[in-house]
């Protein structure tokens, strides 16, 4: 068994788990997440915890039990606390503005960039150079943040572009004559 899968997923108060043969649904105060069951892993509810075990002793099944456990833990944290990713815009004239489920970006192009947010993801702009992406699905929040960052990734000489708040951009030295 994977070392990760040995630890059970603790279910906090206010979170309900329903396990069927085909899928696992986790419902909490922030929303509901549904994930299909993996054929090589059994998931059982043991009181206030979820336990993942490999169906057989194969290496792939044991490895997947740890992966499934981590995904279930992300689901539980997502529906109870939620996830957020912060982005910073560095550069002259770089601005962001949230309008409902759309994010308007001015990134130095000849045209404004409009990014449509998927269902289940909210965007806020506390200032013109800050973007906060929130949601219950960790993978979806990270994917949206990566898509926004990809419009203008930080360049290595001045560091201008869209970056994660915790990202460190290593700057290159300019060419000397």
Curated annotation (Swiss-Prot):
GO terms for cellular component: cytosolic large ribosomal subunit. The keyword Ribonucleoprotein applies. Keywords: Ribonucleoprotein, Ribosomal protein, RNA-binding, rRNA-binding. GO terms for molecular function: rRNA binding; structural constituent of ribosome. One of its GO terms (biological process) is cytoplasmic translation. PROSITE patterns: RIBOSOMAL_L6_1. Part of the 50S ribosomal subunit. This protein binds to the 23S rRNA, and is important in its secondary structure. It is located near the subunit interface in the base of the L7/L12 stalk, and near the tRNA binding site of the peptidyltransferase center. Belongs to the universal ribosomal protein uL6 family. This is Large ribosomal subunit protein uL6. The gene is rplF.
């Amino acid at each position: 068994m994977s070392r990760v899968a040995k630890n059970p997923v603790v279910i906090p108060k206010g979170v309900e788990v329903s396990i069927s043969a085909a899928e696992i649904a986790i419902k909490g105060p922030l929303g509901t997440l549904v994930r299909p069951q993996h054929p090589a892993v059994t998931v059982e509810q043991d009181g206030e915890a979820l336990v993942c075990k490999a169906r057989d002793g194969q290496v792939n099944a044991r490895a997947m039990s740890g992966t499934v456990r981590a995904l279930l833990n992300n689901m539980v944290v997502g529906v109870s606390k939620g996830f957020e990713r912060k982005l910073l815009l560095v550069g002259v004239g770089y601005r962001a503005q949230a309008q409902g489920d759309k994010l308007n970006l001015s990134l130095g192009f000849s045209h404004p960039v409009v990014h449509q947010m998927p269902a289940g993801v909210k965007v806020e702009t506390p200032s013109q150079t800050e973007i906060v992406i929130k949601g219950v699905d960790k993978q979806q929040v990270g994917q949206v943040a990566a898509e926004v960052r990809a419009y203008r990734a930080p360049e290595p000489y001045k560091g201008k572009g869209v970056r994660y708040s915790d990202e460190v951009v290593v700057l290159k030295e300019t060419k000397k004559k």
